[in-house]
Amino acid sequence: VAPPQHLCGSHLVDALYLVCGDRGFFYNPKGIVEQCCHKPCNIFDLQNYCN
């Protein structure tokens, strides 16, 4: 498992595509930016945003 990291902007969107794949994801900028850009997040945090 990758260590928690700060993901912002296009890096965050790319990470969501990788983690969620065909399921897609719902993009809630306020929540995920707070969780993954301002603070580091991990792959499990990202999975919470998959559809």
Swiss-Prot record:
SMART domains: IlGF
GO CC annotation: extracellular space
Gene3D superfamilies: Insulin-like
Cellular compartments annotated: Secreted
UniProt KW keywords: Carbohydrate metabolism, Disulfide bond, Glucose metabolism, Hormone, Secreted
InterPro entries cross-referenced by the UniProt entry: Insulin, Insulin-like, Insulin-like_sf, Insulin_CS, Insulin_family
PROSITE patterns hit by this protein: INSULIN
Gene Ontology molecular-function annotations: hormone activity
SUPFAM superfamilies: Insulin-like
CDD domains listed in its UniProt record: IlGF_insulin_like (cd04367)
Disulfide bonds: C8-C37, C20-C50, C36-C41
One of the protein's GO biological processes: glucose metabolic process
Subunit structure, interactors included: Heterodimer of a B chain and an A chain linked by two disulfide bonds.
Physiological role: Insulin decreases blood glucose concentration. It increases cell permeability to monosaccharides, amino acids and fatty acids. It accelerates glycolysis, the pentose phosphate cycle, and glycogen synthesis in liver.
Similarity comment text for this entry: Belongs to the insulin family.
Name of this protein: Insulin
Annotated organism of origin: Caranx sexfasciatus
Native organism taxonomy: Eukaryota, Metazoa, Chordata, Craniata, Vertebrata
